[in-house]
Amino acid sequence: MALLTPEDLENINRQLHEADSTVRRVTGLDIKGVCKDFYGTTPCCEKVGIVPVTSGNGIIGNFSESLRAITEYFGFDSFVTTMPDVSGYYEAVRNGAQIILMADDNTFLAHNLKNGKIANNQPCTGIIYAEIASRYMKADSKDVLAVGLGKVGFPGAAHLVNKGFRVYGYDADKALLEKTVSDLGITPFEPENPRRFSIIFEATPCADTVPESVISDNCVISTPGIPCAISRELQEKYGVELIMEPLGIGTASMLYSIL
């Protein structure tokens, strides 16, 4: 998946509210409700320490403050440490953090210091977006198209298979597609023989990966991928329910998974 930019995180609260409205239309629950029902957990005054990390490409502008806004949106008490890196971790623990959130170029993690549970953003994001898609109340079948089968897409596709969906998978990386077909038993999707789906799960860092030939009227596209998998024109033409938000849904999944 692509690294986020400060522009992706602008107006994060507005993006969360819009995503919440769409998730509620699609599933009957808001994001918190889906996470609570899926993980069987509820926040209870956990204090979250957000630690900026300077390694690799450095700190993404707005990232830590966006995490603070997201955690508070979902009912957690949170703070951003003054210091980054190891000093920030020490500061977070000394100031009573029960959960640590921190990220470098490769890993975004949540660690519950009380119970020892730890979560990685990539599988948590794939799984929760797949879970939301699986709950689409207007789905006309158990067939799902999964586009992108990497570190986010594979866990999502596996989750859908485990829930009993018939998953048709596509990835531009043929070796990755073949491995997923072998590991999960999904059906490889052939673009030259298109069919339409009411549920589409997309997890790539590329734009316009969902062609018109696979879109059905009022389908749901659940995608953590940035940029957007579908054009605005196609979204409006087919009345697509688009679930797409840069950071909050995946973060909520991480937090609920470690409570």
From Swiss-Prot:
Residue pairs linked by disulfide bridges in the UniProt entry: none
Molecular functions per Gene Ontology: oxidoreductase activity
Superkingdom of origin organism: Archaea
Coiled-coil blocks: none
Binding of NAD(+), residues: 151-152, 171, 206, 224, 226, 245
Annotated residues for binding of L-pyrrolysine: 4, 53, 60, 103
Keyword Manganese: no
Keywords annotated in UniProt: Amino-acid biosynthesis, NAD, Oxidoreductase
Pathway, per record: Amino-acid biosynthesis; L-pyrrolysine biosynthesis
UniProt enzyme class: oxidoreductase
The enzyme's E.C. designation: 1.4.1.-
Pfam families, sorted: PylD_N
InterPro entries named in the record: PylD_N (IPR048757), Pyrrolys_PylD (IPR023914)
Disruption phenotype: Cells lacking this gene are unable to translate UAG as pyrrolysine, and do not produce pyrrolysine.
Catalytic activity: (3R)-3-methyl-D-ornithyl-N(6)-L-lysine + NAD(+) = L-pyrrolysine + NH4(+) + NADH + 2 H(+)
Example GO BP: pyrrolysine biosynthetic process
Family of this protein: Belongs to the PylD family.
Function: Catalyzes the ultimate step of the pyrrolysine biosynthesis pathway by converting the isopeptide (3R)-3-methyl-D-ornithyl-N(6)-L-lysine to the 22nd proteinogenic amino acid.
Name this protein carries in UniProt: Pyrrolysine synthase
UniProt organism field: Methanosarcina acetivorans (strain ATCC 35395 / DSM 2834 / JCM 12185 / C2A)
Gene name as annotated: pylD
